């Protein structure tokens, strides 16, 4: 078996049972991985030098094909309502078949780290069948120094073989695609999908399981730091403005997607970014756009024209086009991946019902309520004339990656907020003056002004009113922002329609929260919007 590249000889991939391979490439850098990718016909080059790969039928994650091993260790700690179980026996059989399938193949190994905090990191070894997958994950996780690689010992292993097709009957799975996670042995097997995001989210899932037991809060969020060292955390589902609003030229970007919060402050789990590129432009997002125009970046499912120019407006393969690049491709990114204790937490929502104010201050109990709710609203497709928005609730702002019960994360968040006296804000980047189809999108200028006032501390001195529907505190006046926009009801021409819409949204919150009622105390229950409606 031919082995090339720097690695710890005492911890080769044979320790994972992988033997009789034709070749193993350890820790290759971008240039070598480009050569191997092109040699094997896995991807193309863009005119600017990015590596452009297509993932075939899977252009996103396959959450319905993800399984967690249910054993004596995970039985009482995993939220089984949200995680599909797999027996240890089925996993063992799958693992043996993965090892058999790999024989005679070339494999690529990247020895990486998840977590910028030395006390709360995991050494994650990622073994891939595709060379471009190796570059992708190298871009996204934290890369150890060349010296550290010689003594690197993996704590977690991911084996990604897209050519492996699972037999549903043999393993008790759903389709030919499988993502099997053994949290006890820290082994992840990915088969039957070429979508690279599965590898990244597997490390996130492992950290989301391991860290709460150490009192560290894992978060699906972006984070940045101001010139005075004040850290801000941004929670938000897709389409709420998390990436856009945390990419602030006056602040240092800590990371765009996954972080931990522990005794030393906030730290990035990753060493790179995985940004959406659909309709990306140099004018709207210059920093992200610049990363797509250079060597080393991986473009996923981006369409190229005959001159190999990327067309970011072309969504014919998928709307979920992406680019993966190291964090240091962003000019004002943190070199350490670490920030202090957060001063502000921002929970972003895009309320397409037009009911919520552009900003509200939350108590720790209200913050836990809205964190567990994880609300935003998607706009329905207009091709059939459907203009009714659709409410989306994804608990902890990232339900698919949370192995434990949401209340564990919620209680930990609330404890840390109280302990460090963090100011919490709910920011609505959705609609004002009416619901989607009637009102207009919240002006980004107003959102940025409100955010700036929250982050510099001046908003704390404003006069607040209590919102009659949600019970949180809303500023009455903020310099540089029209007063009317701060009171959503006043922006609606039809006040009766507003009240009806507000009641409808409140009812959705209440109905969604029923599953958490037995897991929270009275203070959090009292943060529910329905309580306020009843008290009116």
Curated annotation (Swiss-Prot):
GO terms for cellular component: cytosol. Mn(2+) binds at residues 201, 220, 257. Its EC number is 4.1.1.49. GO terms for biological process: gluconeogenesis. It catalyses: oxaloacetate + ATP = phosphoenolpyruvate + ADP + CO2. It comes from the Bacteria. Pathway: Carbohydrate biosynthesis; gluconeogenesis. ATP binds at residues 201, 220, 236-244, 285, 322, 447. Its main location: cytoplasm. Substrate binds at residues 61, 195, 201, 322. PROSITE patterns: PEPCK_ATP. One of its GO terms (molecular function) is ATP binding. Its cofactor is Mn(2+). Belongs to the phosphoenolpyruvate carboxykinase (ATP) family. PANTHER family: PHOSPHOENOLPYRUVATE CARBOXYKINASE (ATP) (PTHR30031:SF0), PHOSPHOENOLPYRUVATE CARBOXYKINASE ATP (PTHR30031). Involved in the gluconeogenesis. Catalyzes the conversion of oxaloacetate (OAA) to phosphoenolpyruvate (PEP) through direct phosphoryl transfer between the nucleoside triphosphate and OAA. This is Phosphoenolpyruvate carboxykinase (ATP). It comes from Brucella canis (strain ATCC 23365 / NCTC 10854 / RM-666).
């Amino acid at each position: 078996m031919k082995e090339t590249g720097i690695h710890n000889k005492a911890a080769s991939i044979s320790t994972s049972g992988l033997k009789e391979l034709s070749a193993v490439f350890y820790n290759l850098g971008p240039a070598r991985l480009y050569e191997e990718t092109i040699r094997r016909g896995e991807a193309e080059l863009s005119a600017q030098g990015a590596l452009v790969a297509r993932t075939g039928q899977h252009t996103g994650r396959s959450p319905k094909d993800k399984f967690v091993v249910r054993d004596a260790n995970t039985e009482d700690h995993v939220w089984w309502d949200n995680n599909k179980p797999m027996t240890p026996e089925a996993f063992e059989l799958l693992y043996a078949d993965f090892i058999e399938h790999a024989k005679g193949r070339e494999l690529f190994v990247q020895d990486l780290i998840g977590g910028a905090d030395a006390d709360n990191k995991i050494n994650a070894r990622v073994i891939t069948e595709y060379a471009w997958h190796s570059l992708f994950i190298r871009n996204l996780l934290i890369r150890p120094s060349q010296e550290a690689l010689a003594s690197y010992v993996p704590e977690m292993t991911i084996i990604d073989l897209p050519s492996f097709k699972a037999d549903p009957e043999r393993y008790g799975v759903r389709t030919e695609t499988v993502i099997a996670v053994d949290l006890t042995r820290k082994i992840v097997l990915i088969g039957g999908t070429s979508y690279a995001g599965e590898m990244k989210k597997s490390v996130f899932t492992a950290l989301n399981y391991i860290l709460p037991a150490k009192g560290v809060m894992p978060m699906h969020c972006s984070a940045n730091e101001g010139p005075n060292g004040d850290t801000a955390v941004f929670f938000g589902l897709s389409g709420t403005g998390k990436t856009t609003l945390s990419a602030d030229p006056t602040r240092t970007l800590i990371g765009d997607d996954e972080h931990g919060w522990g005794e030393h402050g906030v730290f990035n789990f990753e060493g790179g970014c995985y940004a959406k590129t659909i309709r990306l432009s140099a004018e709207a997002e210059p920093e992200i756009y610049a990363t797509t125009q250079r060597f080393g970046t991986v473009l996923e499912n981006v369409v190229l024209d005959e001159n190999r120019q990327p067309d970011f407006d072309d969504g014919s393969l998928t709307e979920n086009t992406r680019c993966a690049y190291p964090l240091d491709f962003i000019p004002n990114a943190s070199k350490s991946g670490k920030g202090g204790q957060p001063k502000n937490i921002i929970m972003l929502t895009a309320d397409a019902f037009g009911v919520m104010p552009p900003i509200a201050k939350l108590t720790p109990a209200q913050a836990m309520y809205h964190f567990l709710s994880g609300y935003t609203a998607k706009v329905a497709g207009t091709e059939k004339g459907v203009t009714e928005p659709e409410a989306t609730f994804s608990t902890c702002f990232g339900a698919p990656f949370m192995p434990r019960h949401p209340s564990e994360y919620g209680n930990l968040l609330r404890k840390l907020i109280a302990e460090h006296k963090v100011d919490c804000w709910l920011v609505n980047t959705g609609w004002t003056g009416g619901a989607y189809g009637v009102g207009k999108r919240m002006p980004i200028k107003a959102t940025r002004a409100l955010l700036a006032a929250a982050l510099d501390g001046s908003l704390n001195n404003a006069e607040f009113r209590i919102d009659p529907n949600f019970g949180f505190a809303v500023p009455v006046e903020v310099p540089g922002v029209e007063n009317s926009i701060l009171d959503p009801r006043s922006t609606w021409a039809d006040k009766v329609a507003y009240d009806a819409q507000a009641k409808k949204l409140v009812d959705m919150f209440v109905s969604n929260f029923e599953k958490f009622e037995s897991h929270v105390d009275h203070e959090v229950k009292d943060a529910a919007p329905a309580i306020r409606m009843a008290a009116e």
